[in-house]
């Protein structure tokens, strides 16, 4: 019993630090967007997503240095799945998330293309040094692209002009914003590390496979900053930040983290296990493709769609549990899950087409 006590305390402390860090970070990000006149969707896609992706980056690079390629890759894949299904799912249950047209026109198609490229490059079982350089190059191009949208001044700045002017002329106020951002990132990163350490220790004591640990416990632990930040943003009515955080984080997870891990692995490349290539990467791509019709329909993510996303994650976790217990009909269950997911995407597309034709 004493062996389990310390990791449980670590998990609890990690969650507390994550919630505290998420609150500080989201406050700083909101005021930063107001002062600079940057649309909150751009802040969500860049500053917030970079801050909340820092735990994934630290954990994955640490895994590479320790020779654990499986943990590094499964962490990224599992985090991307968690972000779409759980983070967007729970956030939309709190309040329906309005989706701006630039997300549908630009960011989701880009995420779809990058996800397919990562899957294709990983199909040989190796994400090479050249692939890593390509991903980092795409990251640089995407960052330049996002910076060019800064001129799209957000409407939210017009409603807060007095507050903005006061902050602009107040040195103490500026330092307070910077302090909140730095403290938020620190608490998010530190909290995630404690949580992951506790989760890994607990999973090891229970005898769980490393890939499954990466896809579930570690991915959930490192994705909690995204979850906490998006939930806080949803409660504050900042749906741009909630959505932008998820899309931006998923882009960074693949471009920055997988790119960096591939480069850090050197000429040997980052090893991608066959189980990830055959099951989890395709599922990640499907969750990404599901974003487009969901965002497209009604211009928002409804509570019903959020509920569906959460159910899909429950199916995914069930698959991992049955895999651990060597379930005899696991292949049939996976086929059924993929068919269900594909039908869901088709249903959402047809629903939107019918709505468009009737309008």
Listing of model-derived features with the role each one plays in the protein:
Residues 1-359:
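Hydrophobic alpha-helical segments, chiefly the membrane-spanning helices
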């Amino acid at each position: 019993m004493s062996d389990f006590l310390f990791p449980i305390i670590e998990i609890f402390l990690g969650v507390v630090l994550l919630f505290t860090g998420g609150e500080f970070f989201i406050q700083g990000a909101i005021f930063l967007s107001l002062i600079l006149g940057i649309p909150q969707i751009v802040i969500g896609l860049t500053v917030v997503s970079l801050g909340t992706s820092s735990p994934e980056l630290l954990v994955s690079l640490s895994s590479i240095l320790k020779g654990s390629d499986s943990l590094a890759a499964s962490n990224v894949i599992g985090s991307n799945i968690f972000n779409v299904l759980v983070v967007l799912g729970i956030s939309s249950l709190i309040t329906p998330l309005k989706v701006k047209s630039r997300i549908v026109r630009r960011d989701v198609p880009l995420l779809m293309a990058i996800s397919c490229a990562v899957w294709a490059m990983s199909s040989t079982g190796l994400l090479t040094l050249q692939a890593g350089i390509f991903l980092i190059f795409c990251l640089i191009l995407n960052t330049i692209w996002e910076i060019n949208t800064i001129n799209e001044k957000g409407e939210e700045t017009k409603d807060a002009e007095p507050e903005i002017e006061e902050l602009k002329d107040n040195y103490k106020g500026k330092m307070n914003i910077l302090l909140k951002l730095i403290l938020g990132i620190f608490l998010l990163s530190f909290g995630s590390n404690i949580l992951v350490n506790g989760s890994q220790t607990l999973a090891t004591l229970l005898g769980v496979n490393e890939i499954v640990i990466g896809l579930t416990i570690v991915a959930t632990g490192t994705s909690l900053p995204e979850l906490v930040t998006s939930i806080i943003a949803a409660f504050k009515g900042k749906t741009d930040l909630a959505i932008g955080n998820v899309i931006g984080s998923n882009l960074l997870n693949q471009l920055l983290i997988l790119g960096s891990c591939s480069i850090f692995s050197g000429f040997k490349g980052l090893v991608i296990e066959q189980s990830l290539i055959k099951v989890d990467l395709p599922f990640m791509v499907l969750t990404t493709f599901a974003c487009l019709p969901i965002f497209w329909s009604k211009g928002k993510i409804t509570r019903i769609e959020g509920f569906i996303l959460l159910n899909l994650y429950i199916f995914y976790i069930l698959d991992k549990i049955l895999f651990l217990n060597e379930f005899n009909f696991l292949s049939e269950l996976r086929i059924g899950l993929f068919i269900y997911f594909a039908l869901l995407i088709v249903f959402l597309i047809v629903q939107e087409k019918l709505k468009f034709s009737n309008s």
